[in-house]
């Protein structure tokens, strides 16, 4: 069932860009676009403005995820993937990109740089205990389930 996300344009770096949209009927993420042109040198990271501020419904978050095509073709990804937009954040959405490739990558204003997935949030109540219930896995981590 769709939820309403209120959007405000911020930054005013040029003519308004299209609002994020789903590019196919089955897409999970809305495409976020760069609100200014830039070039990422190899090894460089940068916070890229989107020109948008969001008002997410209570009980939801925005997950900013990398675009697989940028990673596959250019080695460009996100430093903190996924990035989290809390429901009470009202500032401009920025995307932290990094160039893991060996060549500079140029972006034009309006290029798609990330995906925004809106998801419900479950809030946990923590209970301090002296022991945890046993499980088959136990404390094995960092690849232990594939051995």
Curated annotation (Swiss-Prot):
- Give the signal peptide, or none: none
Q: Which EC number(s) does UniProt give?
A: 3.6.1.23
| GO biological process assignments | dUMP biosynthetic process; dUTP catabolic process
Its UniProt entry gives the catalysed reaction(s) as:
dUTP + H2O = dUMP + diphosphate + H(+)
Q: Tell me which SUPFAM superfamilies the record gives.
A: dUTPase-like
Any one GO MF term held by the record is:
magnesium ion binding
Keywords of the record: Hydrolase, Magnesium, Metal-binding, Nucleotide metabolism
Enzyme class, one word?
hydrolase
Q: In which pathway does it act?
A: Pyrimidine metabolism; dUMP biosynthesis; dUMP from dCTP (dUTP route): step 2/2
Could you say which residues bind substrate here? 67-69, 80, 84-86
Cofactor or coenzyme needed: Mg(2+)
Q: Which family does it belong to?
A: Belongs to the dUTPase family.
What does the protein in this record do?
This enzyme is involved in nucleotide metabolism: it produces dUMP, the immediate precursor of thymidine nucleotides and it decreases the intracellular concentration of dUTP so that uracil cannot be incorporated into DNA.
Descriptive protein name: Deoxyuridine 5'-triphosphate nucleotidohydrolase
Q: Which gene encodes it?
A: dut
